[in-house]
Amino acid sequence: MREKVVSLAQDLIHRSSISPNDEGCQKIIAERLEKLGFQIEWMPFNDTLNLWAKHGTSEPVIAFAGHTDVVPTGDENQWSSPPFSAEIIDGMLYGRGAADMKGSLAAMIVAAEEYVKANPNHKGIIALLITSDEEAAAKDGTIRVVETLMTRDEKITYCMVGEPSSAKNLGDVVKNGRRGSITGNLYIQGIQGHVAYPHLAENPIHKAALFLQELTTYQWDKGNEFFPPTSLQIANIHAGTGSNNVIPAELYIQFNLRYCTEVTDEIIKQKVAEMLEKHNLKYRIEWNLSGNPFLTKPGKLLDSITSAIEETIGITPKAETGGGTSDGRFIALMGAEVVEFGPLNSTIHKVNECVSVEDLGKCGEIYHKMLVNLLDS
């Protein structure tokens, strides 16, 4: 299986699919799946290409989810080999997307192919949900496919997202949930004036100082058995004209919260508004909700992937919910059990992104055993 996975991964890496461009990756995948009898449905939205492929006719529906888009390469001169050459050096496959996530995407596809070849009349439905809009806006990708499926009353029972979840060794971590993410873009109004005549102006930075202290020290919650406490970080602050003798007219503050299931986005919005009113600030705020938290509690999917990892590499993975958001947050809206598993994440988005070819082969075996555990038991 390793050779098949690595070969497909190289084919995908060769295509410079900077988000939201697909550059023919999904066509390669669709042609392979179609030969095995998968039903292929294209779901393009604006400049994003999405693929929904399925094999079988009855529940449960087991979906593999992934993305063909990648982040920009950065300075290509810093790479040991060209970022889209997909070279193998000392057992490592190098290239943009090798770990995030064309390698695991290839492993999921080969696993599905091998299972269908051996079990053409399998029970359940094996599906693949693939998008080219995960690394950037994530507005026309998985969420649009999910919305389409929901309007048709189609179900996903279990979903494996192939994000690179492993930390130090393949299989040491699986993600069974993610925190929510919400960003506030806050504009605090003042009155511009000369710094020598502060009584004729109103400095929004000074006015906001106590509010910022409260915002950054407030304890939102203590977390729970599945999630760490909610975290707030200020990402950007800007005010002033660049001159040292002008009191600014406005202060811009951008902050982000990664929040657990102990709070909601509405609770966060309400509390921030209370703080702003408490400090008598003139303001306007724009909120951007990237996704609510989701959690897959111990059950059939988590048991199946845990068992598959134990059988293949002999370790028991730890289920965690840390890290950034993923498209799993959209699929969870369908009521599906969602788990993320993939190769090591230590080089993702970096120069010289790479993945072990041995690990890619193991990923394919693990995904295949997961299918066996879910459909043959």
From Swiss-Prot:
It comes from the Bacteria. Zn(2+) 1 binds at H67, D100, E163. Its EC number is 3.5.1.18. The keyword NAD does not apply. One of its GO terms (biological process) is lysine biosynthetic process via diaminopimelate. Zn(2+) 2 binds at D100, E135, H349. Keywords: Amino-acid biosynthesis, Cobalt, Diaminopimelate biosynthesis, Hydrolase, Lysine biosynthesis, Metal-binding, Zinc. GO terms for molecular function: acetylornithine deacetylase activity; cobalt ion binding; succinyl-diaminopimelate desuccinylase activity; zinc ion binding. Belongs to the peptidase M20A family. DapE subfamily. Catalyzes the hydrolysis of N-succinyl-L,L-diaminopimelic acid (SDAP), forming succinate and LL-2,6-diaminopimelate (DAP), an intermediate involved in the bacterial biosynthesis of lysine and meso-diaminopimelic acid, an essential component of bacterial cell walls. This is Succinyl-diaminopimelate desuccinylase.
